[in-house]
C-alpha cells in the first residue's frame, strides 16, 4: 500500500469518526429536547390535565379560575417551540446518517477496488517484465470521485483506457468519447505506477463533482 493510500485511509477514518461524533451529539440534543417537551406536558397535566387545545375560558367566556393560565400558556408555547426544534433536529440527524452511510458505501467500494487491483497485479506480475508505453498521465484526482474509488492515483501513466491504447491514441478526445459512451459501464484501465503495471476497473458515473471521472489527465509526448 502506497503512502498516498495510507494517508487517504487515515483521512477517511478520521472523517468517519467525526461524523459519528456529530451524530452522537445530535442524539444527545434530541434527548434533551424530548425531556423538555415531557416536562412541559407534565405542567399541563398538573393543571387539571389540560392539554394543548382545551379552552382557557369558561362557558360564560371568563378566564378559567381553576388553572394557572400563565403556566398553561407558557407550557403550550414552550411545547410548540420545542416541537419545531425537534423536527429540525431530526432532519439534521437524517442528513448526517445519510452522509455516514454514503461514506461507508464509498469505503466499501474502494476496498473492493483495491482487492481487485491487488489480485490483478499478482496475475500481471507473472507476465512479461517489459512495460508497455503509456500515452497519458494523471495529474489530479478529486476525493470521492469515480476515479478515486477505482484506485486511480496522481502520476499514474495510462497504458490502456477501455479501447484506447498507445497504438490508436491520437488526442484526449479519444478518451472523452469512450467515457461518454460508457457511463455506468466499467472500463478496464491499465496504468504504470512506480515501474509496475496495475489493472483497474473504472466506471464513469455522475457524482457530486464535475464530469464522469473526477480526474484530469494530460497526454504524454510521443
Curated annotation (Swiss-Prot):
Keyword Lyase present in the record's keywords: the answer is no
Q: Which GO terms describe its molecular function?
A: bHLH transcription factor binding; transcription coactivator activity
Name under which the protein is recorded: 26S proteasome non-ATPase regulatory subunit 9
Q: What does this protein do?
A: Acts as a chaperone during the assembly of the 26S proteasome, specifically of the base subcomplex of the PA700/19S regulatory complex (RC). During the base subcomplex assembly is part of an intermediate PSMD9:PSMC6:PSMC3 module, also known as modulator trimer complex; PSMD9 is released during the further base assembly process.
Summary of subunit composition and partner proteins: Interacts with PSMC3. Part of a transient complex (modulator) containing PSMD9, PSMC6 and PSMC3 formed during the assembly of the 26S proteasome.
UniProt modified residues of type Phosphoserine? 128
Q: Which organism is it from?
A: Rattus norvegicus (Rat)
| Annotated ranges, domain PDZ | 108-194
**What SMART domains is this protein classified in?**
PDZ
Q: Which GO terms describe its biological process?
A: negative regulation of insulin secretion; positive regulation of DNA-templated transcription; positive regulation of insulin secretion; positive regulation of transcription by RNA polymerase II; proteasome regulatory particle assembly; type B pancreatic cell apoptotic process
**UniProt keyword annotations, A-Z:** Chaperone, Phosphoprotein
Higher taxonomy: Eukaryota, Metazoa, Chordata, Craniata, Vertebrata
InterPro entries, alphabetically?
Answer: Nas2_N, PDZ, PDZ_6, PDZ_sf, PSMD9
Task: Note whether Chaperone occurs among the keywords.
Answer: yes
Q: Which Pfam families is this protein grouped with?
A: Nas2_N, PDZ_6
**CC annotations in GO:** cytoplasm; nucleus; proteasome regulatory particle, base subcomplex
- Reading the lineage from the top rank, the first entry is Eukaryota
What family does the entry list? Belongs to the proteasome subunit p27 family.
Amino acid at each position: 500500500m502506497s503512502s498516498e493510500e495510507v494517508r487517504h485511509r487515515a483521512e477517511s477514518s478520521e472523517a468517519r469518526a467525526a461524523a459519528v461524533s456529530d451524530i452522537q451529539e445530535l442524539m444527545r440534543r434530541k434527548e434533551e429536547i424530548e425531556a423538555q417537551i415531557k416536562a412541559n406536558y407534565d405542567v399541563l397535566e398538573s393543571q387539571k390535565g389540560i392539554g394543548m387545545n382545551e379552552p382557557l375560558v369558561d362557558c360564560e367566556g371568563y378566564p378559567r379560575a381553576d388553572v394557572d393560565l400563565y403556566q398553561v400558556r407558557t407550557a403550550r408555547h414552550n411545547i410548540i417551540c420545542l416541537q419545531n426544534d425537534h423536527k429540525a433536529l431530526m432532519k439534521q440527524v437524517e442528513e448526517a446518517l445519510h452522509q455516514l452511510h454514503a461514506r461507508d458505501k464509498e469505503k466499501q467500494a474502494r476496498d473492493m477496488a483495491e482487492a481487485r487491483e491487488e489480485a490483478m497485479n499478482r496475475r500481471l506480475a507473472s507476465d512479461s517484465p517489459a512495460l508497455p508505453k503509456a500515452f497519458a498521465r494523471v495529474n489530479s484526482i478529486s476525493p470521492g470521485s469515480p476515479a478515486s474509488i477505482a484506485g486511480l492515483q496522481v502520476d499514474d501513466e495510462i497504458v490502456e483506457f477501455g479501447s484506447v491504447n498507445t497504438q490508436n491514441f491520437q488526442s484526449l478526445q479519444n478518451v472523452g468519447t469512450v467515457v461518454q459512451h460508457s457511463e455506468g459501464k466499467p472500463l478496464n484501465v491499465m496504468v504504470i505506477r512506480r515501474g509496475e503495471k496495475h489493472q483497474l476497473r473504472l466506471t464513469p458515473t455522475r457524482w457530486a463533482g464535475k464530469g464522469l471521472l473526477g480526474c484530469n489527465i494530460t497526454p504524454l509526448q510521443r
